[in-house]
Curated annotation (Swiss-Prot):
Family in the record: Belongs to the endoribonuclease YbeY family.
EC assignment: 3.1.-.-
PANTHER family, A to Z: ENDORIBONUCLEASE YBEY, CHLOROPLASTIC
Cellular-component GO terms for this entry: cytoplasm
Name assigned to this protein: Endoribonuclease YbeY
Protein's job: Single strand-specific metallo-endoribonuclease involved in late-stage 70S ribosome quality control and in maturation of the 3' terminus of the 16S rRNA.
HAMAP family: Endoribonucl_YbeY
Organism of this sequence: Rhodopseudomonas palustris (strain BisB5)
Residues reported to bind Zn(2+): H152, H156, H162
A molecular-function term among this protein's GO annotations: metalloendopeptidase activity
Alphabetized InterPro entries for the sequence: MetalPrtase_cat_dom_sf_prd, YbeY, YbeY_CS
Highest taxon above the source species: Bacteria
Cofactor binding note: Binds 1 zinc ion.
Length: 195
């Protein structure tokens, strides 16, 4: 897995649309594999469909040219995310979501030169206990918080970041629009930024 998120937006990503989605274009939606890597996720029977719906909404809303791409989402536990966080970021503690964009020096060229083969966008890992605790602490439905984190992780894979205030505002605004299209309230209304 790559170590860092790319800064800014890729040239292969289109401008954001308004939040009134039409039918989702399957040409924009990346093939997404959801892997349940920890038994604790069995308590959330709809987790896989929640993640898939969030990623489809994100890809459609930002009009991403990701239809020939693949990504994997690992639903794991705090121990799994802590190990990844320690290995790839040098931070020995769990977090809610990690994104590992695939190395793509020039994503636009990769989109054009794939010869029909899917391009790997990267991987997302989501920690059950942290997501559950945050949702409970913030009084949010678990599915809403999981949707937010799936969207957040996906946006990192396609080039969004929050290293600067300007980047954070762009990313958060995009997240709000995507989630509003899913009927999910502003996740930042009464809290600090996702980090």
């Amino acid at each position: 897995m790559p170590q860092s998120n790319a800064g800014g937006r890729s040239d292969c990503i289109g401008a954001a649309r308004d939040s009134s989605f039409g039918p989702m274009s399957s040409s924009a939606i990346p093939a997404t594999e959801v892997v349940i890597a920890a038994d604790c996720w069995q308590a959330e029977a709809s987790a896989e469909s929640v993640v898939l719906r969030a990623i489809e909404a994100a890809a459609t809303m930002i009009d991403a040219d990701t239809g020939d791409a693949e990504l994997a989402v690992m639903l794991t536990d705090d121990d799994g995310v802590r190990a990844l966080n320690a290995s790839y970021r040098g931070i020995d503690k769990p977090t809610n979501v990690l994104s590992f964009p695939a190395p793509q020096p020039d994503y636009q060229d990769a989109c054009q030169d794939s010869g029909g083969a899917p391009q790997m966008l990267g991987d997302i890992a989501i920690a059950y206990q942290t997501v559950r605790r945050e949702a409970d602490d913030e009084g949010k439905p678990f599915a809403h918080h999981l949707s937010h984190l799936a969207v957040h992780g996906f946006l990192h894979l396609v080039g969004y970041d929050h290293e600067t205030d300007a980047e954070a505002e762009t990313m958060e605004s995009t997240e709000r629009s995507i989630l509003a299209g899913l009927g999910i309230p502003d996740p930042y209304a009464d809290q600090d930024r996702v980090s």
